[in-house]
Regions:
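Charged, often Cys/His-bearing segments associated with DNA-binding zinc-finger transcription factors
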Residues: 1-59
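Basic, short loop/linker segments at the boundary and entry of helix-turn-helix/winged-helix-like folds
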Residues: 51-86, 131-134
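Short amphipathic alpha-helical "interface-anchor" segments enriched in bulky aromatics
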Residues: 53-54, 102, 364-385
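Short, positively charged, Gly/Tyr-enriched micro-motifs
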Residues: 76-151, 155, 219, 275, ...
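Short, conserved catalytic/metal-binding motifs centered on acidic residues
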Residues: 87, 102-103, 129, 133, ...
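Active-site-proximal, Lys/Arg-enriched surface segment
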Residues: 134-221
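Electropositive, glycine- and tryptophan-enriched low-complexity nucleic-acid-binding patches
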Residues: 198-264
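An internal, acidic/charged active-site-proximal segment
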Residues: 234-343
Length: 385
């Protein structure tokens, strides 16, 4: 792409008002054209760089997208599966909030050209409309897409580009976290959860929503990848939401183990998961865990921690950057069939302390790194809010 400047020569412009107006219009048009050209060039370069990144890290992505079973009748196919799926993937990469908005944002020759280049479809002249993509996604098997995600994750792990992010040089950190997806006063299906608002009044109503538990792989502090999702299902009116979320987490853990049977994993999550069954599930799968802990999670553990920390006396204060923090920990807390350790961190001058419970061994030399790993789940949740 080459840009050329238009040269305009002016003579006695002060005495020629019509000519002055004409020159102003020409300059304005020139400025707009040059700006559009720069934006077009920037978009094109961004597209080229994106193609390079995808082809370098995920050379098998396009073939895998093309192998997804297409349930559409051949006579009605206008867009290849790879174009439909890649458009949806790019919509997520660029944080576009809806598929309807994607059709608007992507409606440019540059974007169409880039997606055509990415999908190796030179004859692509238009992108599929958002309704076309949604109808296609409803028909395909989600397990096929999950398989692709797992294959991409395996390739990232084999690349050894993120080895420094492992906990204690061995265990991949996976965050488990619940997220709400949309809400409505209309019941979508029998699996959706609901909340009752203004209960017992004339304004009482039910709000229906979907809730999922996600597994997110930590590759770097600013690179956290969602690798698997499990829906929290309505298990009956008497079942509390936290019990539903825990059960969804256990199903998610089974799927993770099946997809990555030999992967050394440390699961991190909030205090909701601090319970006997979670500890046992991790032990059975040969995983470690690092969880936020609150007093109400397991009162007996909190009571023992408060009494033992005075005896073990591991606490110390340390300055880190511009902050000064208080570190403390207690080892060998016996709970049912699990030996636990608990760590505490508090920034000087603040009232709130952060507590973490784990089956990792804790010593003076590794408590700071352990707490930093535990806080990643909290930081991730904060960045999304």
């Amino acid at each position: 792409m080459e840009l050329r400047d238009n040269r305009i020569e002016l003579k006695n412009i002060s005495s020629q008002a019509p000519q002055r107006k004409e020159v102003f219009i020409k300059k304005t048009q020139e400025s707009i054209n040059r700006k559009n050209a720069r934006e077009h060039l920037a978009q094109f370069h961004l597209g080229c760089e994106l193609v390079k990144v995808i082809r370098h890290f995920f050379p098998n992505l396009l073939p895998m997208l093309r192998q997804v079973h297409d349930p559409r009748h051949p006579s009605y196919i206008t867009y290849d599966s790879s174009v439909l799926l890649m458009t949806r993937i790019l919509s997520s990469i660029f944080y576009i909030s809806s598929m309807r908005k994607t059709s608007i944002e992507f409606n440019s020759e540059t974007v169409i050209e880039n997606i055509g280049m990415l999908c190796e479809t030179e004859e692509l002249s238009e992108l599929p409309y958002w309704e076309t993509i949604n109808k296609y996604l409803k028909k395909i098997d989600p397990n096929e897409l999950q398989h692709i995600v797992c294959e991409l994750v395996r390739r990232l792990l084999r690349s050894r580009a993120f080895e420094q992010s492992k906990i204690r040089g061995k265990y991949w950190q996976i965050l488990v976290d619940g997220t709400s997806l949309g809400s409505s006063r209309t019941e979508w299906d029998k699996r959706s959860l609901y909340k009752v608002h203004n209960k017992g009044t004339t304004e009482e109503y039910k709000e229906y929503y979907y809730y999922v538990v996600e597994a997110k792989l930590v590759l770097q502090d600013n690179i956290i990848v969602s690798i698997m999702t499990e829906f929290v299902e309505n298990e009956g009116e008497e079942v509390e939401k936290q019990d539903c979320e825990r059960n969804a987490c256990y199903r998610l853990m089974e799927r993770l183990k099946k997809a990555f049977p030999m992967l050394p994993i440390c699961l991190c999550g909030d205090s909701l998961y601090a319970c006997e069954r979670f500890f046992e599930e991790c032990k059975a799968k040969h995983w470690h865990f690092l969880l936020r802990f609150k007093e109400g999670s397991i009162p007996s553990i909190d009571k023992e921690y408060q009494s033992l920390k005075q005896l073990q006396n591991h606490g110390y204060e340390k300055e880190k950057g511009r902050q000064t923090g208080w570190y403390d920990y207690v080892t060998k807390i016996e709970y049912r069939n699990t030996t636990l350790q608990m760590a505490e961190y508090k920034e000087t001058g603040k009232e709130q302390s952060f507590y973490f419970i784990t089956d990792f061994s804790i010593q003076h030399k590794n408590i700071e790194a352990l707490i930093e790993s535990g806080r990643k789940r909290w930081k991730n949740n904060l960045s999304e809010s």
